[in-house]
Amino acid sequence: MRTPPVSAWRGEAGGSAGRPAGVPLPPARLPLVRGGRPLKRWRWVGAFSAGTMLCAAHATIGGVPVTWWAIWDGERLHERTQRRPGAVRMEPGRVRASPLDLRFEEGPGVEVVSPHGAQYVWTRKQAGMPIRGSVLGRPFEGYGFVDDTAGYHARHTAWRWSAGVGIAESGARIAWNLVDGVHDGPQHSERTVWVDGTPHHVPPQAFAGDLSAVGDLRCEAVAVRARRERMLVFASDYEQPFARFTGALPHAGSLREGRGVLERHDVRW
């Protein structure tokens, strides 16, 4: 197996010291294929309030677009997936689709580069920012999460992930990003807990096989977006519950309230 072109790296608050050189990374343009692996990239935006949880995303897999949105309105799940680029529109600090229009303030986030197979992957996570606008024709105010990802993932990739926002028993505003399967190295991972906006790298947190727990978090799913596809060289088994969270997080302590998502994805691409 060829040696990956990068070593794992993590940067916070816009810091770029040690950022891998010699390979294209956002915001530079990334080639469509590198080392025989097609480029995958996406922006996923989540927004969470007491009565509504939602996500919207735009992805390209080897140049082929797919967009989706899902909204849990407190009673039922609304969702749509389309294989065309304009159904979800992403702009700096804004996401729009037919049932939603939301604005938020962009920040530097936490940026991570990791080897993956014989190539590499990049991500930037922003979490806990106020997000406002309209959802299903009603005003919305909550807190958001943004996942920007790009890279040349291995042919078979599988991960489990959780992202959310909430309030600690201390009264601190918190957010989290926990993962197993990608960007999960012991020292330079994307695992992060934000406490009043300050990011803290955290050790691995074990995921229950049924996504009912992550570390000391307990997860109560309220609605599940799931999709299974098999098309020629592409196969995907995907599950993403919206959930309420109780329990505790490193650096944040016990939660007074928590809302967010979990995800299990096993894909050949």
Regions found by a protein language model. Name each.
Residues 1-269:
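Structured soluble/peripheral alpha/beta segments that form catalytic or ligand/cofactor-binding pockets
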